[in-house]
Design a protein with these regions (language model features):
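Flexible, charged surface loops at secondary-structure boundaries
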Residues: 1, 54-55, 109-114
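Alpha-helical substrate-recognition element adjacent to the catalytic core
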Residues: 4-6, 10-88, 93-95
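Short, flexible active-site-adjacent loop segments at beta-strand->alpha-helix junctions, enriched
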Residues: 10, 66, 102, 122-123
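Short catalytic/ligand-binding loop motif for oxyanion handling, primarily in non-cytosolic enzymes
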Residues: 14-17, 68-73, 104-108, 125-128, ...
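A short acidic, amphipathic alpha-helical/loop segment
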Residues: 48-52, 107-111, 128-131
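Conserved beta-strand termini and adjacent loop/short-helix elements that scaffold enzyme active sites
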Residues: 63, 98-101, 137
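Donor nucleotide-activated moiety binding/catalytic core segment of transferases
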Residues: 93-115
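Acidic, Mg2+-coordinating phosphoryl-transfer loop and its flanking beta/alpha structural elements
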Residues: 114-152
Length: 152
């Protein structure tokens, strides 16, 4: 059976909302929140546990929304900035989906089948998840993954 961890990006692995003036930046189509956000966790530790889970057969998917009401040019810039963020911090993933704001995230990973866990900070998104279970990213994601790894 496929086992899939589906991560949101903004507010889950990247502290996007911790960037001063993030909303004003987005309204001005400025990618700074995407380029300056810090990781929520020690990425070395996160990479280690995710790579161990991948060795145990889990797939890691990042499914993230683009900015709300953005132009095509800004969407393109956001895609590039998010990709560079993931590369800069070495977040290990098997698939990456950057989709229009509000897209049902389950539609991005449904084809993978199996047991899927969505890790997201948005309650509405978690409540709409239909492919398995969810974990609230406002809690300690790293501890959750360690427990998943060691069956705790």
């Amino acid at each position: 059976m496929n086992k899939v961890l589906v991560f949101d990006m903004d507010g889950t692995i990247a502290d996007f909302y911790g960037v001063d003036g993030w909303l004003d930046c987005l309204m001005a189509e400025d990618t700074r929140p995407y380029t300056t956000a810090r990781p929520f966790y020690d990425m070395w530790a996160m990479m280690e546990v995710l790579n161990e889970l991948k060795n145990d057969g889990w797939r890691v998917v990042v499914t993230t929304w683009l900015a709300k009401n953005a132009t095509k040019e800004f969407d393109k810039a956001v895609r590039q900035a998010k990709l560079e963020w993931l590369e800069k911090f070495g977040f290990p993933y098997d698939e990456l989906h950057m989709v229009k704001y509000g897209t049902t995230k389950a539609n991005c990973t449904r084809k993978l089948g199996g047991y899927q866990i969505l890790i997201d900070d948005n309650t509405k998104v978690r409540n709409g998840w239909t492919l398995g279970t969810t974990f609230d990213a406002n809690k300690n994601v790293y501890e959750f993954l360690k427990n998943l790894r060691f069956g705790g």
